[in-house]
């Protein structure tokens, strides 16, 4: 587990590498075949860099050091600073999910049944589009695998010892 100070120092270094490249998250994403949000997650140490992605990321970010690559390839300690919820853009995203969440849940249940959207087998992207009025609009896409809740039958519980009956 990374200490928060150590993680912050690594994130600062990674963001400096991005800054030196002069590229946006979306430009790096286009060069690496990743989503723009996943690139941001990698550079914020919220995602695990896979070995087969290293060459493309190195090409996109030429000043990325071996040391940083090695750190990025370690499973991260995924967390967030609770104070970040106060940041206006994050606050509004949270507000939107809370406001629309109950309706979204109902539609998931109607379309799929009793279950949830995975945040593990999950893709996320942020895109800029022009609205009908010609003004810029933000499109946030959450693309998660559907996971049905299971009926908990004891016969399917593999960790439960088999009971012998007399």
UniProtKB/Swiss-Prot annotation:
<dbReference type="GO" id="GO:0009651">
    <property type="term" value="P:response to salt stress"/>
</dbReference>
<dbReference type="InterPro" id="IPR003712">
    <property type="entry name" value="Cyanate_lyase_C"/>
</dbReference>
<dbReference type="GO" id="GO:0008824">
    <property type="term" value="F:cyanate hydratase activity"/>
</dbReference>
<comment type="similarity">
    <text>Belongs to the cyanase family.</text>
</comment>
<feature type="active site">
    <location>
        <position position="95"/>
    </location>
</feature>
<feature type="active site">
    <location>
        <position position="118"/>
    </location>
</feature>
<dbReference type="InterPro" id="IPR008076">
    <property type="entry name" value="Cyanase"/>
</dbReference>
<dbReference type="Pfam" id="PF02560">
    <property type="entry name" value="Cyanate_lyase"/>
</dbReference>
<dbReference type="InterPro" id="IPR001387">
    <property type="entry name" value="Cro/C1-type_HTH"/>
</dbReference>
<protein>
    <recommendedName>
        <fullName>Cyanate hydratase</fullName>
        <ecNumber>4.2.1.104</ecNumber>
    </recommendedName>
</protein>
<dbReference type="GO" id="GO:0009440">
    <property type="term" value="P:cyanate catabolic process"/>
</dbReference>
<keyword id="KW-0456">Lyase</keyword>
<dbReference type="InterPro" id="IPR036581">
    <property type="entry name" value="Cyanate_lyase_C_sf"/>
</dbReference>
<comment type="function">
    <text>Catalyzes the reaction of cyanate with bicarbonate to produce ammonia and carbon dioxide.</text>
</comment>
<feature type="active site">
    <location>
        <position position="92"/>
    </location>
</feature>
<dbReference type="GO" id="GO:0042802">
    <property type="term" value="F:identical protein binding"/>
</dbReference>
<dbReference type="InterPro" id="IPR010982">
    <property type="entry name" value="Lambda_DNA-bd_dom_sf"/>
</dbReference>
<dbReference type="GO" id="GO:0003677">
    <property type="term" value="F:DNA binding"/>
</dbReference>
